[in-house]
């Protein structure tokens, strides 16, 4: 069942221009082991928005909250099921403001930007999956999907 209608909007639209990205999907990057010299090369699986601690994160589209809690690397995290196999994930939050089982509307505040998990500073990391495959969230901001 499709739970959204219309376009997806930036989850950082409450505080940032839609092009205020600090790291884009697919960028090569090195993950830093906090407190160690560990460096792991990898593929960036989401879209990072700059921003200060405590700024509002909003739902890019309507959906059902299927996870809200802490993850080791991702920190405080929220996952929304938008239906039709489309899921959004929001990592590193300073505070989660929704609960599992809650239906959220587009633009609803779901959490606050933070620096939890494995990070070098406060930011919003947004991931998007379609039928279990990670895709570039930016595509969903600039195109309309059925």
Regions from the PLM with identified roles:
Residues 1-13:
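Extracytoplasmic and endomembrane cell-envelope/extracellular-matrix remodeling and assembly machinery
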Residues 15-146:
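Catalytic cores of peptidoglycan-degrading enzymes
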